[in-house]
Amino acid sequence: MRKRADCAGTLQVNGPGQIVGAPLAIRIGDNAHFGSGFYIDARGGVEIGENCHISRNFVCYSVNHDYEGEALPYDDQLVQKQVVIGINVWIGMSVCIVPGVTIGEGAVVGMGSVVTKDVPPLAVVGGNPARVLKFRTKEHYERLIREGKYGGVSGRLVLKPGRNDVG
């Protein structure tokens, strides 16, 4: 029997990938896009906001082995920590996210990054471990939200109702 993730609307998946722990442990917002080769272990809970675009070879874990457990190198217990990816996030190719991380609204995660700590809203991060390189322009970001302009799963512009509750 195939399990399905809880998806709020349009979802495009470009090639094979795997979600472990679906359907109850993962929620995916509208207008989401996954590149091929993704692996998401959602047993600790994963939330992916609307308008998130995630490139190829994405790896996300919300569980880890208990290396402080009753066996070496680890026992059979899993430590679960939810991963939250906010709305309007762009994640580049070959990014890895560890358990317990929150990626803030509008953030950009550069190709090959290993995200080990929370990412602030509108931050552009990169590296191993990922660090803040700069921030998106808040005024520009808020204008696009007010105008309801979003990139669709095909890369084309998608117009949605604008929001006036920003800025």
What residue ranges belong to the model's regions?
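Terminal amphipathic alpha-helical/low-complexity segments used for targeting or macromolecular assembly
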Residues: M1-R4, A8-T10, N51, H65-E70, ...
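Conserved catalytic segment of ABC-fold P-loop ATPases
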Residues: G104-A107, P120-L122
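Short beta-to-alpha loop/turn elements within the nucleotide-binding domains of ABC transporters
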Residues: V101, G112-S113, V119, N128
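Short-chain dehydrogenase/reductase
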Residues: H33, W90, V108, V124-G126
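Flexible, glycine/small-residue-enriched loop-and-beta-strand segment within the central core
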Residues: G15-I28, H33-V101, R136-T137, E142
